[in-house]
Regions:
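Alpha-helical transmembrane segments of multi-pass small-molecule/ion transporters
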Residues: 2-270
Length: 270
């Protein structure tokens, strides 16, 4: 199931989202913003977990930063915001995906790997570019900056596959989820969810106090920074030697938190 999502439905969802969207060049600034928010959270997590054992550090690094925007936030945005804000979500997600679609996995292998890495730059680059979702986002950003549009036939072809991505990503998450959680493992989940909530509070303050955007964009970005952990994080956790089942359980809790936050935002800010 994970291979289907990683190599087929998620890349098609990315291609369709960008191919079907119209946006102004100024909105491309959302790409570095999405990356900065995700990478900033990763750096903080790195700084506060130096004494954690290797598997636990991989668990925190891969699940504390970044957001599930394509499978979770985008449907909410399409329901309560204008089509332009849906495009903004896709652009923000492009920056977010630099970490979620391979960046965090590559860096975590370097930081919490089981053996010494002889060529760290080559190691990170290999992990990054071996991630098909990352390659797809990178290609789309380059084409967008160059003003090249995807062929309408390709957009139409990817639409039914893209529509299946949300269901398959959530189904994959359900297959990985572990409901047998001891007190010690539950404490790790509580720390992770608390850390993500703290990041969301800080990022919300940055959005409302520091960014020169209108209130509609602020409301959108608030929804995005309260979105749940990436649907890919449990798989990357397992691939990095961490507890993939526990990551799946924690992911489900962040989805519940995200639904509550999105509902409150829709009722109060939109």
């Amino acid at each position: 199931m994970s291979k289907i999502v990683f190599t087929f439905t998620l890349p098609c969802a990315v291609l369709h989202a960008f191919g079907a969207a119209d946006f102004s060049p100024e909105m491309l600034l959302l790409v570095p913003l999405g990356f900065a928010f995700a990478f900033g959270a990763y750096l903080v997590t790195f700084a506060i977990t130096p004494r954690a054992k290797r598997s636990d550090r991989a668990f925190y690094l891969l699940n504390a930063c970044g957001f599930n925007l394509g499978c979770f936030a985008l449907p909410f945005v399409q329901a309560i915001f204008s089509p332009t804000m849906a495009v903004a979500t896709c652009l923000y997600d492009a920056g977010n995906a630099f970490m979620m679609a391979g960046g965090s996995y590559a860096l975590t292998g370097l930081i919490a790997g089981g053996s010494r890495i002889q060529h760290p730059v080559r190691f990170v680059a290999k992990r990054l570019f071996s991630s098909l979702p990352f390659d797809t986002y990178l290609l789309i950003i380059v084409l967008s900056v160059a003003g090249v549009r995807l062929p309408a036939e390709l957009v139409a072809f990817t639409e039914p596959i893209a529509n299946a991505n949300s269901f398959l990503a959530m189904f994959m998450l359900g297959l990985m989820m572990s409901f047998s959680v001891s007190r010690e493992r539950m404490a790790k989940v509580a720390r992770l969810v608390g850390l993500r909530a703290a990041f969301s509070v800080v990022l919300t303050c940055i959005v409302w106090l520091a960014l020169p955007v209108d209130n509609v964009m602020r409301a959108l970005l608030t929804l995005l920074v309260w979105s749940p952990a990436s649907a890919l994080a449990p798989m990357y956790t397992q691939m990095s030697g961490g507890d993939g089942g526990l990551a799946g359980f924690a992911n489900a809790l962040t989805i519940i938190l995200g639904v509550i936050a999105a509902t409150l935002i829709a009722l109060t800010l939109v």
